[in-house]
Amino acid sequence: TAIMEFSGKELIKGEPDASSFPSGGLRATFEARGYTAWDCTSPAFLKKDATGVTLCIPTAFCSYRGEALDKKTPLLRSMQAIDKEATRIFHLFGHTEVKRVTPSVGPEQEYFLIDRDKYLKRKDLIYTGRTLFGAMPPKGQEMDDHYYGVIRERIGSYMKELNEELWKLGVTAKTQHNEVAPAQHELATIYTKANLAVDHNQIVMETMKKVANRHGMACLLHEKPFQGVNGSGKHNNWSLASDTGINMLDPGVTPHENIQFLLVLACIMKAVDRHADLLRQSAAVPGNDFRLGAQEAPPAIISIFVGEQLEDVIDQLISTGSATHSKTGGTLKTGVTTLPDFDKDATDRNRTSPFAFTGNKFEFRMVGSSDSVSSANVVLNTIVAEAFKEAADELEKAADFDLA
């Protein structure tokens, strides 16, 4: 048995070729020196395939002049930027014990499963990932028999093996279910820090395809593989958590009294309004542009949904300069003696908004199913960090903090 050596020096810095791939014009063809750097915040893992067992080490990839040639480097830079500015916000409100703020991400991965023998007969699916011609099926997604139906045994067997393979790789797969369109399904992982969530989602997409092959199926990650039914997206659930366990996007029971939350909310709304073009561009890949607004949500236009409770608080602040109350959800009475009455949430959940507040996080629903979630989070982190910085600069020099 051959034993290969791998030194600590090689772990910390590697030198792969940095010219033989598209770089958007960052590099001339002859400029070949690049560096990899170990991202020690994302655990290494062992991957077993036909070639044997491979040690996979998450790394950043930069050119000789420092240009980012990957999706990890900009993401880590954006996380560093929002950490710095969000920590300033915490300190302004007396939380001086906070030393670090980390963006948390939980992506929901949608996909289609079809028989592999039928897939191999469709050159359009093989070459483009979607059907280019064909007849509409006699039945599409008009009923709820698929979305709310029992998961078929064959699909359940696939999901079981997929979960097992992902957990072996350290990916915390949690939820799986049918989706709206026939043959469409979804897998969601437990939320974690942004760079780890991005790495995990790449593993999820790769593993989905491998496991599908073993079960005689093909996994389609194209955003719009079939006309007339829903396509596949990747909902990006995003929040900000301190090292002391505080979620900056938790409004609490009385949001109108939570001044820190209202400032954070205002900064996020300002960032999305000012840089809607960047946020839209972060989800712009050909397949996804074909999907957005076609027989499904979200539309291709950026808008924000904050819910009835927060919208009412915002209206109070705009009209009077202060907020005196917050709407409550009240009690839901089922009308059945054997079922309990229970407290409702303060607002309904908007399932179609591209950027919706969902209780203690924002859900960016535009990302395409085949795309990396890195770009969307780079933009989110960066534009919100900019808004935080502007707010912190004003508040730190204000003579009257409460008035400012």
Show where each model-derived region lies.
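Short glycine- and Lys/Arg-enriched binding-loop motifs that mark or flank ligand-binding interfaces
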Residues: Q227
